[in-house]
């Protein structure tokens, strides 16, 4: 009885010695769906030797027979391979291409009477909807994972936004700075795998912009897009709310096809001009107070729900002098913090207010500056020259004309004076002659037919 015990122990030791391999600790490798993974298996000696790769069901995937690579009847036979150039170095890794979630399994490498187990976990991260989304829409990322796993996901946007989640990550209200490559890290069993997802946020580069112009200047509006697409088709419209108007109106409508712009309809007042190529570009011939206000450009893209929006503002400045009053005014949407001032060149501000109109009574002669500023930064400037009101400089031609008129008046006056004087003298001479004639006549009746009977010569 006692003699049988050592024999059984000897038999057990013999069986263990005859085992083809000794199982070592299991390694965990994370892979990405659609990607390629390499499962390593190294021999203790750097030489070519026999090895076999099997799955958890002991089905052969690939191995070496003589000097040739052989494959078994597994589902990976057409996607599995090994680096033959590294066999002489004792490296017998297995490469699996175009990974699938169902490739997640425990794989066994048998080499030099030992076994190496590698647990492969394949994950996939995809966007539930199109990766081209309008600004303000939501983004949802879904993680595909093998059964039994409990991964965690952390994503970082191009703008530095960090979002954590499990099998689903939701990003509401996408912003233009979210456009670009998102980096998502999947963690499982202290191992990580990184995903790169390109998200395109369809938006204009700016949410709003303000153009500052002096009255009469040409105005340029630009609406650059924050993305590029091979084919871009859609339609757009610019609605404008003038500060002086009671309601908004459509200034222009246009079509966009393969990055070329064609105008459909445009108002006659003002008559905008539009560029034929991207970026969208509008020209207003003159900046006038009646055009100052705010506009909203919308762009509807083909096969997309919703529209792109950009707000644009126009501020117009006018500097005028009327009689003894110098005035500076602005029209359009301005912040209450903006300062409007009037100053004589090379001197301090005469008047400065947080208002839309300032004025100076009886301004000094010289070059005056009308300035619209924001915290000391000049946004808009208009110059106006004030000339002395008295004495007014007289031009040489005016002097000649005035001299001629004065000479003519003087000559005419002298002529009239001498004519009147000559006539007066003639009448006076006639009267004196008549008096002398009467005195020289005899005292006879002035009317002979009446005094004939009483009058006789002496």
From Swiss-Prot:
Residues covalently joined to lipid (S-palmitoyl cysteine): 419, 422
Coiled-coil residue windows: none
Modified residues (Phosphoserine): 433, 440, 456
Extracellular compartment spans: 26-396
Comment on protein domains: The Ig-like V-type domain mediates the interaction with MHCII.
Protein role: Integral membrane glycoprotein that plays an essential role in the immune response and serves multiple functions in responses against both external and internal offenses. In T-cells, functions primarily as a coreceptor for MHC class II molecule:peptide complex. The antigens presented by class II peptides are derived from extracellular proteins while class I peptides are derived from cytosolic proteins. Interacts simultaneously with the T-cell receptor (TCR) and the MHC class II presented by antigen presenting cells (APCs).
The protein's name in its UniProt record: T-cell surface glycoprotein CD4
